[in-house]
Every structure is written in structure tokens, then in C-alpha cells.
């Protein structure tokens, strides 16, 4: 019988992040408490940079951005917040890095959980994804349920279902 497989990945949809940033920017420009505060949100390759006039206003900008990201189904677990630091012109900034791919130690932890479950499935790390294969589709569904119930500190998605 042929093997069935799927990949466990951790990715953020950058188009949805871009849309959320545009919506948050519009709200910042129209909110009374944030007018004339030099508050802005910039999207970089794998990070979001927030600027504002002080920490209180930066926190408000962060809350607006988080609300817009949640509405667009972008997982907040995939974001890592940097420290708030002083910037030029008496402003503060914060960098938020976006998780793209599963880090090595988290991938090893996922593989260990699958192996410890004693299910008849093989898990292997392939770059920044974890491939799980088994002869039985039901076993794969049980593993998906197992992984969803565990908290690895990252957001995981299941993609690339294959039946060979």
C-alpha cells in the first residue's frame, strides 16, 4: 500500500499582513488621540517596524495592528516583539519579526512528540518544515489532532497532503 503524507509548516501570509497594515495606518490617521504623533507602521521583508512619539502611543498602535491582524486571520503566535527603543526626533520604535518556517529546536520537539505517541508514522525534518508520512490516513488525522492540541509556542499549519 502507498504512503500518505503531509507537511507541518509555520508561515504567515504576507499579503494579509500588508492589508492589515494598510487598514491600521488608515485608523491611526483618523483617530483623535493619535493625530500629529508621528505614528507609523512599516512593513519590511520579514519584520514590521512601529514608530510613535512615546511608549503609550506605541502601545496603542500595537493594539490597533493586532486587532487588524486578528480580523485578517493572521496568527499572533507567529509574531515576536522586540524591545521598545528610542529613535531619532524624540520618538520610540519597536520591531516585530514574523515567523517564517519552523525553527530547528521546535521541529525536533514536534518530531519527538510524534515518535512518543507510538503511532505508526514517520516524521522527518526537511529544512523549515516537518514531513509526516504513514500508510494509514487515519493515523495522519490522529497526528494532526495531537499536534493541534499541543502548544509549541509557534503557529502551525498543515499543508501538502499527498496520497501516493
UniProtKB/Swiss-Prot annotation:
Q: Which InterPro entries match?
A: DUF520, UPF0234-like_C, UPF0234_N, YajQ-like_sf
A Pfam short name: DUF520
- Does the keyword section mention Nucleotide-binding? yes
Q: Which cysteines are joined by disulfide bonds?
A: none
Q: Which domain of life is it from?
A: Bacteria
State any single GO MF term. Answer: nucleotide binding
Could you list this entry's UniProt keywords, alphabetically sorted.
Nucleotide-binding
What GO cellular component term, any one, is given? Answer: cytosol
Q: Which family does the similarity line name?
A: Belongs to the YajQ family.
The role this protein plays is:
Nucleotide-binding protein.
- Name-wise, this protein is Nucleotide-binding protein Acid345_2028
Species lineage, top-down?
Bacteria, Pseudomonadati, Acidobacteriota, Terriglobia, Terriglobales
